[in-house]
Curated annotation (Swiss-Prot):
It comes from Rhizobium leguminosarum bv. trifolii (strain WSM2304). It comes from the Bacteria. This is Imidazoleglycerol-phosphate dehydratase. Pathway: Amino-acid biosynthesis; L-histidine biosynthesis; L-histidine from 5-phospho-alpha-D-ribose 1-diphosphate: step 6/9. One of its GO terms (cellular component) is cytoplasm. The gene is hisB. One of its GO terms (molecular function) is imidazoleglycerol-phosphate dehydratase activity. The lineage of its organism: Bacteria, Pseudomonadati, Pseudomonadota, Alphaproteobacteria, Hyphomicrobiales. It is an enzyme of class 4 (lyase).
């Protein structure tokens, strides 16, 4: 009888005095998403993250938006990272590494990931304005810092060039999504093995 593949899903509920967040992910999904954070631009970016990684995501965030968007964005990154880490389990069989240069109109951004269990963010992205609409551009970095730290991944993001700040932010999310899509995939030649000479990635 054929062996049934284990479900690679993860769910997290996180409540603080600042935010209340629930996240569910399915690494073997089709990029379906149901997202509500109260921050329109952020919802748009998270939809790109789900769509292009093919990770199904359900995200419900309620935060102190009367102050600003910071806590909602950062804490959502924390919860998504924790859910992805749960879904990865002991990380046996995964491809582990991936990188991509992603183009969008005049903008080009590179993302490289290592699902190593060692959290680290290298961020080389500059925006020419402090806001995209009402969204603080500095929060793009805050999101990816929280994601990398809590997913246990090494993440490098480099914007090669670009003029439109919306495009720069969007290519960051899309490039990370495409890199995650490849890195989280099961390598058929690696099934059941941890892709590390150490024997563990957690």
């Amino acid at each position: 009888m054929a062996e049934t593949a284990a479900s690679r899903t993860g769910s997290v509920s996180r409540k603080t005095n600042e935010t209340s967040i629930s996240v569910s992910v399915n690494l073997d999904g089709t990029g379906k998403s149901k997202i509500s954070t109260g921050v329109g631009f952020f919802d748009h970016m998270l939809d790109q993250l789900s769509r292009h990684s093919l990770i199904d995501m359900e995200i419900e965030s309620q935060g102190d938006l009367h102050i600003d968007d910071h806590h909602t964005v950062e804490d959502t990154g924390i919860a998504i990272g924790q859910a992805i880490s749960k879904a990865l389990g002991d990380r046996r069989g995964i491809t582990r590494y991936a990188s991509i240069d992603l183009a969008m109109d005049e903008t080009m951004t590179k993302a490289a990931v290592d699902l190593s269990g060692r959290p680290f963010l290298v961020w080389n992205v500059a925006f020419s304005a402090p806001k995209i609409g009402t969204f603080d551009t500095e929060l793009v970095r805050e999101f990816f810092q929280a994601l990398a730290q809590n997913a246990g991944i090494t993440l490098h993001i480099l914007n090669h060039y670009g003029a439109n700040n919306h495009h720069i932010a969007e290519t960051c999310f899309k490039a990370v999504a495409r890199a995650l899509r490849t890195a989280t995939e099961i390598d058929p030649r690696q099934v059941g093995r941890v892709p590390s000479t150490k024997g563990t990635l957690v």
